[in-house]
């Protein structure tokens, strides 16, 4: 009995010790950490402290980024939105060319077209073609800046500067609507002064920006393949929509400034287009009622005009000062600092000794690249584009006004970003960056690869600074530059989405760079237009929308939901 009690006691002791060891072991184990809850897209947007909008020039998505992996690019274009048709609706056999480096001769003709009434020979069939194959980056086809607008059909290879420039292409309000053809995307050739050039595209993978974003250690980025220019037409109007989501007004303009369109909505004759009636290519919309249903009419500026205030150019009529609200006004009211940084601004605006100033102390402009006839201190570069400075059209930003201080030189942006080290980013919360003409990628007067190199410089400067940790960089092209794209914009044909009589127009190239993206490289297929940039700023800083379009579109926080490309 005694032995049995001793055995039971020992067993109890062993169980107690085992239990104690188990308890002690359990206590020594660290408690598992709670999984960190993923931030929503809205929360990620709220954590962005700096926005940098780099506004490049004149390229449709297919023309520039159509060869990027994972996107709705050129290889996915259906024949019905690729094959170009004549004014009568007949598919061309060949592409007629008038860029001096694409005509036959000098190129050998391998195609004959008899669809236009007068036959022509060409080296190009009716299909998209590689520009690089005929005008590589090394081609000496770029104009001297002093004569940049003297070569309507481009500079012959061997007689210009290196850079692989092409001729310019028309990109205007009424013409683009004809080119889109209700979403058929098949009248880019017929509705253009540059005809077959509209179907050219660049080797996406040869672009400097592509190389930078595929190099080891590249920043996280999104490519947006469903992003459209806000308004039909050109740079002037789309810069206005970038800052105001509205078309400029001009009450009771001189009649000579009004556009006149024919029954097809076209205002001009081109090599493959013959007007059906009286036409006039003007900066102001047609008089109401519009002769073509759905075409905008009234007292609105739709094509390039000059600002009233310096700096302004000598070509074209001046637009009366604008007074409607802009995103700049909205941000100022919320005490959010911002700046428009433009290449060449100090020289053009007469900011003597300011960042980027290169014209000495007077009494004459001394920079060799100044526009001939300029009077000191307004010494604009030959390729300074006055209509790319949208705030300068507004009375609130006139010389002498307090808000004028928000208009600065791109050189200052680079200086401030470069000097941002440690934990401090010296950039304002919102920066718009507009490169000078030589560096903005615009066909005709700028080299695409050189402009893309400058874009890399801008992005790299940000990414190497203290700003990189909380900055969203938005790279967008202002408009299509007259170049074909296969995706129908909202409001064209059966394509749904926010639209009105002003746009959106063709799909354009766009990128977003942010450390908060879900993967090193994502593709965002969400539908956007240029006013999505405004919506992003409006939502981030809780300011009222400027118009109906920016109130309706998706903002760019959608990039935080985008998936990695496969």
What positions do the PLM features span?
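Bacterial N-terminal signal peptides
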Residues: 9-18
